[in-house]
Amino acid sequence: DVVFNNAGYGLAGPFEGATDKQLTDEINTNPLGVLRVTQAFIPQFREKKSGLFITTTSIGGFVTFPYNSVYHATKWALEGWSESMAFELKPFGIGIKTVVPGGIKTDFASRSLQMSEHPAYKEKVQKVLEIFVNPERISKGSTSEQIAEVVYEAATDGKEQLRYIAGADAKAVYAQRLQVGDEVFRAGIEKVFFG
């Protein structure tokens, strides 16, 4: 049996301008939704001595971009939680895995992305948004079918592998961060977005 946690909510914009409702919606959906669903199914899996949890996280759980701090916080939380839970569940024959996509060609931005606003950040946020909505960048994202193939692989390969980096863009960004290190990577991100 497999439980696939795939709900997602994105909050972008300056943290200073985020409303309490925006923060609560982000936290209730991304980490708490996954934790609650998983907790509800653990007893059944434990009794059967088998089962697998798969959670869609994000490359945003390993790298960050400006004006996405709350979204990143929730995705980093899920990655850390999943890694810890793998130890906790393994003695009961239960697996846990994450699928870590980059950009996906869906209507997520129009359907699930919320923006916080604050006048002090308006100009910088606009510059960042122009980069994010650039058609060339969007065209490099994965299709939902490509990500579904990775989910299927995670569900059926029988491996104890924790993470499945999904999509060419996610793999490239993740590899780059590992290769150059945190500070050089962060400096590169800053240059891309702010010159």
Language model segments and positions:
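Conserved NAD(P)H cofactor-binding loop of Rossmann-fold oxidoreductase domains
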Residues: 6-11
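Substrate-binding pocket helix/loop in short-chain dehydrogenase/reductase
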Residues: 14-15, 22-24
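Active-site loop immediately N-terminal to the catalytic Tyr-X3-Lys motif
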Residues: 16, 63-69
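Active-site helix of classical SDR
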Residues: 38, 74
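Residue(s) in the substrate-gating loop at a strand-loop-helix junction
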Residues: 58
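Active-site-adjacent segment of SDR/Rossmann-fold oxidoreductases
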Residues: 63, 84-95
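SDR active-site lid
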Residues: 91-161
